[in-house]
Amino acid sequence: MHSVSLIKRKRAEPPAQLMNKCIIIGKIEKAFQLFKDEGTQEHLMYNGSRLYATTIDVTRVSGIVDKITVAIPEKLYTETISERIIVRGSLRTFNDSRHKLILYVLAESISPANDVHDTNLLTLSGNLCKKTVFRKTPLGREITELLIANNQYDNDGHSIPSYIPSICWNANAKAAEAYSVGDWLLVKGRIQSRVYEKTNDSGESVEYTVNELSIGRIIKYNRPIV
């Protein structure tokens, strides 16, 4: 089986990592399995290590469940992982062979959650890489959609950019509507999953789940935040 590495380009002396920290506490939906490109079935790797992935169910106070893909390096993998876990890591994305953007948490550590409440927190900095889209939902809520670029580096100095689909609401949405491509942003929020229906080539209605960053706080800066 061939492997595909999440590596794009290399710099001799990589700059400091941009801010990208998250903590996820929830229930494992299924056992960890090798993380693969669903189109090619190639293994995904990071720092020379194969990745294993699963879905974590995180329940909001409202009762809505967010399903979050979590990937761990092989060195963290064990078949005896607790049913509920604490994951600390960073939010990453990649485009698979089907041109589908995959959003996942790359774990730096995992531990049993025991009686700890479900948690879904993310702090991230990056620059706006696409013009914002402001609109109103059918229920009249104002939202702005953003695409935030966050660059990280592996142990060999290879650049690994992630492009984070994000959404902000109401007053934040009005402020973000005026942002320009290239603006540096610091955001805090949570990773949410959203189900929508799409008609396939056969005319059938199929449900899809997408993940995005739901922003609770957003600040514009004139420099990168590390």
Kindly give the residue locations of the regions a language model identified:
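Single-stranded nucleic acid-binding surfaces, predominantly the OB-fold ssDNA-binding core
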Residues: 2-226
